[in-house]
Amino acid sequence: MAKSNGENGPRAPAAGESLSGTRESLAQGPDAATTDELSSLGSDSEANGFAERRIDKFGFIVGSQGAEGALEEVPLEVLRQRESKWLDMLNNWDKWMAKKHKKIRLRCQKGIPPSLRGRAWQYLSGGKVKLQQNPGKFDELDMSPGDPKWLDVIERDLHRQFPFHEMFVSRGGHGQQDLFRVLKAYTLYRPEEGYCQAQAPIAAVLLMHMPAEQAFWCLVQICEKYLPGYYSEKLEAIQLDGEILFSLLQKVSPVAHKHLSRQKIDPLLYMTEWFMCAFSRTLPWSSVLRVWDMFFCEGVKIIFRVGLVLLKHALGSPEKVKACQGQYETIERLRSLSPKIMQEAFLVQEVVELPVTERQIEREHLIQLRRWQETRGELQCRSPPRLHGAKAILDAEPGPRPALQPSPSIRLPLDAPLPGSKAKPKPPKQAQKEQRKQMKGRGQLEKPPAPNQAMVVAAAGDACPPQHVPPKDSAPKDSAPQDLAPQVSAHHRSQESLTSQESEDTYL
């Protein structure tokens, strides 16, 4: 497949047609003409009146295609309560993920508070852990020159990403600069994969909620954990998921499945942009954010559910099917979905209640993969296994998070005084008897041999499990006794605690 050149117009590939135009066609939406017109304002758009335009709560220009009308506002008291609960979860993240993951899932379904959404996405996706594991990596990639063949394509795509949003309205503005940095860094981080233009809207949404470095690592997690293979050259993963979606549709909405089968409409004609852009180009913005909240928590299952809900309500009744007699009418219906079925409260409720599980998706994936191998041979792009949400990512890659303790623990020798005590602790009675017998047998007074076990004591009084020490018989009898020097645990060496770690996390 030819690499993207950023020049083809917006269209979906026909059934059986090559996917060579898919990677570039996603860069241009249906409003490409107005996009270019708006971007022609350049970086002086503020001087030409942009500063006087009203901006909605999401950062879109009021009256533009990205802006929304009246929204269901969450009462301020409820919002503050949710913020308090989320702050507690984020400050004790490992504990909540280990013991109360279901509660996190329920709170993601209710919606993450806007002030904490960016931080929560970093924790849910594992991007926070990746950043800690790779300090300075993004700066290193950012300072590198990059591959010219990708830089030209990325630069041409910058003004097409949410041109009615205040971050990206100005050509060469800070939003477009950060978007360029993130996408260029990814081409250097994964040179074998390069750049797919569907990654641009994903990165842009992340940049609306967090700085460039954090957005980069969240993008890495999406491409490698949530949607592996989606942005590879052959787009094999998205083709497989198209077949999975179509198979699941038969159980969710037989009427819609039968109609699409009769019209011989390939799933790639309607689901490619949905899945590759995670509905960021399809749904109203309030719905996009709610879908992403659940997506980061529960994984690609949410993307499948949203697609199935849209298909079910667009083509799921005989009356709706009668209005779509041909392929063109059907495709137009799916491209111009009713605002009612995309409305935030309605869509989220339908998605939560739809009984489609990870097990069903994985079972269907094996079936479709077997069919692919029988008809087309082996996959050319080997992508890592897909992980279904935050819990699976945490279990697969826990990361070096600090232990949930009030203070670091230290190791003390047995004969050292305990914290807060003045006297040196006496050895056990059994050890005293053995020492007396040895001294009587030798006829001389000797210093008692140093103990061979260390006692681990927490600085705050919390006991930690003792380290393994070789048995007493393993040491040579004629060796001179030596005092054990105090040793510091690995946790103490890291000089990390929950408080110090979270104090660095001030970006909301």
From Swiss-Prot:
Q: Where is this region: Disordered?
A: 1-46, 396-508
Q: Where is this site: Arginine finger?
A: 156
Q: Which Gene3D superfamilies match?
A: putative rabgap domain of human tbc1 domain family member 14 like domains (1.10.8.270), Ypt/Rab-GAP domain of gyp1p, domain 1 (1.10.10.750), Ypt/Rab-GAP domain of gyp1p, domain 3 (1.10.472.80)
Where does the record say this protein resides? Answer: Cell projection, Microvillus
Q: What would be one Gene Ontology cellular-component term for the protein?
A: cytosol
Q: What is its main location?
A: other
> Site Glutamine finger: which residues?
197
Q: Name one GO molecular function term.
A: PDZ domain binding
Task: Return the Polar residues bias intervals.
Answer: 36-46
**Which keywords describe this protein according to UniProt?**
Cell projection, GTPase activation, Guanine-nucleotide releasing factor, Phosphoprotein
- Give positions of region: Binding to the PDZ domain of EBP50: 505-508
Superkingdom, taxonomy of origin: Eukaryota
Q: Which residues carry this modification: Phosphoserine?
A: 39-40, 45, 407
What post-translational changes are documented for it? Exists in both phosphorylated and non-phosphorylated state.
Keyword Phosphoprotein listed: yes
Q: Does the keyword Phosphoprotein apply?
A: yes
- Annotated Rab-GAP TBC domain ranges read 111-299
GO term, biological process aspect, one: retrograde transport, endosome to Golgi
Its biological purpose is as follows: GTPase-activating protein (GAP) specific for RAB27A and RAB35. Does not show GAP activity for RAB2A, RAB3A and RAB4A.
Entry remark concerning the domains of this protein: The arginine and glutamine fingers are critical for the GTPase-activating mechanism, they pull out Rab's 'switch 2' glutamine and insert in Rab's active site.
- Subunit notes for this chain? Binds to the first PDZ domain of NHERF1 and NHERF2.
Q: What is the protein name stated in its UniProt record?
A: TBC1 domain family member 10A
Q: Which organism is it from?
A: Homo sapiens (Human)
